[in-house]
Amino acid sequence: MMRLIIIQSIFLLTGSLFNTSSGYTQEKWTLEDCIEYALEKNIAIKRQEISARQATNDYKQSKMERLPAVSGRASHSFRSGRTFSYDILEYVNQEYQYGQITLQGDLTVFSGFEAQHSIKKNEYDMKAQLSGIEEAKYDVTMNIVTYYLNVLSNIEQQQIKEEQLEVTLEQIEQTKQEVEVGNKSKGDLLEIKAQASRERLELTRAKNNLKLAYLDLRQLMNLDTTESFRIKSPEDFTSLSENAVKTTNTIYSESVNEFPSIGHAKYQMKSAEKNLKIVQSKRLPHLSLGAQYGTYYDELRKDQFNLAYDRQISENMSLVASLQLSIPIFNKRRIHNQISNAKLDVLDSKYWLEQQKQDLYKDIEKARNEVISAYEEYQSNLESLESMEEAFNYSQEKYNAGLVDIVEYRIAKNNYNSAKSDAVSSRYFYLFKMKILEFYMGKEMEI
């Protein structure tokens, strides 16, 4: 349950999100807010919770199966036909009524420990379903992180495009003045205007990409609102540092016993083992105790022997107790084949658990290497951005002084713009990979 506790603890740090009965009314959403809302509204999680409740009911019922079963029955019948008459001592055609009242119960004394094994099996099935809830929450959480970071990335990409266009528009005004005094040619002005047109197109695309990113996030959250939906951009990225990353084995050893998919597979294996015990118990003798207490009445006895209904019911009371022993001898090898299949189920569940552990180790190993690679790429892009910025500033100074033409200036500006976009993309790529690794490490999912 550690993963669920980790996710829930995030929400306690973010404060209350519900302000009115209509739902979420805050202007900007943090990552924790988005995760909380998505977990609450996700249909797959709700369905998994239903399955868990059903498994819980099965577990409770299996414990009740050890108790005796008691039932009562009453019947009243009408009959028409040949019946022996005690009045004339011969068979005659007549109509009459009769009935009976019984109370019966039975108790399983010994069933080869099937009841005990069934209780444990249903308990493991219940725990497997609860682990399934955590699995579903893990998937939703990671998807929200992905889409949330995609929105943040597109926000910065749009800001970059806006800044690029703003610089170009300022350059247009400056070039106009240079053209008027004869320091620049009209061709230079047309080139810069063409550059502005291209940057307007890029800005339009950036805005559309941001709208789609918001739409993807909102749909994943199942957030149906006509109000403005905006997320909160972090003030800084404190996790964007070369933190000491634990070894793969260390992260794996800390996660293997707490990760939802491992817990799910482990409980499925234990359930299969108990199911084998249940099937094997069918080879053992079964002993049950039964009892029946009842009475009956007959209209013929009332008419022919002057026995009233209440007197018949009182005099006809009887008690029957039985002890039943069932010993399996030969049943066409049905139990033998059931045991064989149950053993194969146990073996398959063990392989599945081992497969889940291998996949977890591989995922952690891959995530760790991707974090290191993404961090190195991000640092390289920062260095490239710094160099491109210096080159652009130098080119801009030379262009303003008339020492370089518009083509060289435009190349320097495009290189600088590209470097800024690459730096933003690599930053969010690194941050996403770091969030995945931190989740394996048991850290809070926050930005």
PLM segments and residue spans:
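Periplasmic alpha-helical coiled-coil/stalk elements that build and connect Gram-negative outer-membrane
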Residues: 57, 139-254, 370, 374, ...
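Short segments within alpha-helical structural elements
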Residues: 50, 201-223, 385-443
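Sec/SRP-type N-terminal targeting helices
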Residues: 46-50, 63, 95, 109-137, ...
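Short flexible linkers and secondary-structure junctions
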Residues: 24-147, 287, 291, 333-336
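Bacterial Sec-pathway N-terminal export signals of envelope proteins
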Residues: 24-71, 81, 231-275, 372, ...
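Small/polar, glycine/serine/threonine/aspartate-rich low-complexity segments that form flexible
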Residues: 73-107, 234-243, 277, 290-327, ...
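Terminal intrinsically disordered/low-complexity segments used for targeting and assembly
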Residues: 1-37, 207-250, 438-447
